[in-house]
Regions:
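Bacterial N-terminal signal peptides that target proteins for export
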Residues: 1-9
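Bacterial N-terminal signal peptides
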Residues: 8-19
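Sec/Tat signal peptide C-region and signal peptidase I cleavage site
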Residues: 20-24
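A eukaryotic "domain-start" boundary segment
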Residues: 25-42
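Glycine-rich catalytic cores of cysteine/serine-nucleophile enzymes that process amide/ester linkages
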Residues: 38-116, 333-334
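Second-shell loop/turn segments in exported
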Residues: 50-51, 115-124, 143-152
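A structural motif
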Residues: 125-138
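Activation targets extended, charge/polar-rich intrinsically disordered C-terminal tails
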Residues: 139-434
């Protein structure tokens, strides 16, 4: 029996540990209070844009370093999983991210291998502020605190850094950044997506007027480069009551080579898109006139291909936009004026275009009616721009899609002529024979 006492005591201890996990042992020393504020350095890290769409915006993190204990950790709020459940949640507008910590040097090597800029700004905080921010970051990594619901413009991996810095500064950062921003969120999106014009147009198409409203500099800091810029300009009140720069020093760990810089202003694609839209619509009219004159297969097949192309390029996004508005929590897609330009009806041009290519007798008339509806909706969307509530900045999409729709409606109306001519010729021949 005496021998069982130590064993029972040990088992009881293990049960207590299981019931109350010892989170303290998982915390960095600045999370437990072991680190002293005067021994800490806090760095805002800005990573430049990358190659894939998700990395076009860049990325940001915070590094906490304890010089006395020779420890450093990088805190990254951009962690997410590519499993099936994540894709489903993202499709429904509920994407869950989390924060994790990692080795700063290993992270820097990784971004260097991707040829992405790595820039550091050491924050000029008081020892008490450094200790507070370090503890905040360390506690956020704990399993019960780490997850958050990602929102691209208002709650992302950079706004979390901004909010943490502002908290330890007593709201000074928010106050200093409360002035008007340089441009709308849509203009920022267009700047950063300039590296991929087709994807830029798709994103432009999917987003409503939420991102066209005036914003503050604080809201612009959803972008890593904007937060970096604003922190560099910031003056904060120090322990002596005097204002000091928030950035004590800048460190460039790596500068990318051969990567295009993000433009300061959004690109002006409107005139180019208008020319493309007019060329597409005019081309459809030209094919219809050719078909009317010759009655050959080539113009019919080419006109069918134009319909198939339009259905693929604009019909699928139009259908997706409608579904996102009606059935998901992607509020940035709601009540989108681009549905006047492309919508689920637009997708019908795909099968009808295929039927036209294969010589269906009913396809031309069905397409004509469809295009009259689509062109009418596009014109209606343009006319409604006169009302204040229709304020979405979709002019470049109007310039591209509306001439196409009007041109196709005209082309399919003209395509009725050959059938009418053939019928009148047949009637004349029968009368002559009689």
């Amino acid at each position: 029996m005496p021998r069982l006492a130590p064993l029972l005591t040990c088992l009881l201890g293990l049960l207590l540990l299981a019931a109350h996990p010892a989170h303290a042992q998982d915390l960095a020393p600045w999370g437990t209070g072991e680190s002293r504020g005067e021994d800490l350095s806090i760095y805002l890290v800005t990573f430049g844009p990358g190659d894939d769409v998700a990395s076009w915006w860049g990325h940001g993190s915070l590094v906490v370093e304890d010089h006395r204990l020779q420890q450093a950790r990088l805190y990254n709020y951009g962690m997410f999983s590519f499993d099936e459940s994540m894709l489903l949640r993202y499709a429904m507008g509920r994407l869950e991210f989390w924060v994790d910590d990692a080795s700063p040097n290993a992270t820097f090597r990784f971004y260097r291998s991707l040829n992405r800029d790595v820039r550091l700004q050491e924050l000029n905080l008081t020892p008490a502020q450094r200790a507070e921010l370090g503890k905040l970051l360390a506690v956020n990594v704990l399993p019960e605190n780490r997850n958050y619901l990602y929102q691209h413009y208002s709650d992302n991996c950079v706004t979390r850094l901004r909010d943490g810095i502002d908290k330890v500064l007593g709201g000074q950062l928010h106050q200093a950044m409360s002035g008007p921003g340089r441009m709308t969120l849509r203009d920022h999106v267009r700047r950063y997506t300039d590296v991929g014009p087709p994807m830029s147009l798709l994103l432009d198409f999917l987003m409503n007027d939420e991102i066209d409203q005036p914003v503050t500099r604080w809201q612009e800091a959803f972008l890593p480069d904007e937060l970096e810029r604003q922190v560099a300009e910031m003056q904060v009140v120090g322990e002596d009551g005097q204002k000091h720069p928030l950035v004590a020093r800048n460190v460039t760990v790596y500068e990318s080579h051969g990567r295009p810089k993000t433009p300061d202003q959004p690109p002006k694609y409107g005139p180019v898109l208008l020319v493309l839209g007019l060329a597409f619509g005019g081309g459809a009219v030209g094919l219809s006139l050719w078909r009317r004159k010759s009655g050959g297969r080539a113009p019919r097949i080419l006109l069918g291909l134009q319909n198939v192309f339009f259905g693929l390029v604009f019909g699928i996004p139009g259908f997706a936009l409608f579904i996102m508005w009606m059935f998901t929590e992607h509020t940035v897609t709601y009540r989108n004026e681009n549905l006047f330009l492309a919508n689920p009806l637009t997708l019908l041009t795909l099968p009808l275009g295929i039927q036209l290519m294969f010589g269906s007798e009913r396809a031309p008339e069905r397409l004509r009616r469809l295009w009259l509806v689509l062109a009418g909706l596009g014109v209606l969307g343009l006319v409604l721009k006169a009302l204040p509530m229709f304020d979405q900045d979709n002019w470049r999409l109007i310039a591209l899609i509306l001439p196409m729709s009007v041109g196709m409606a005209g082309a399919l109306t003209l395509s009725r002529a050959p059938a009418a001519n053939r019928a009148s010729d047949a009637l004349a021949s029968s009368l002559k024979a009689s």
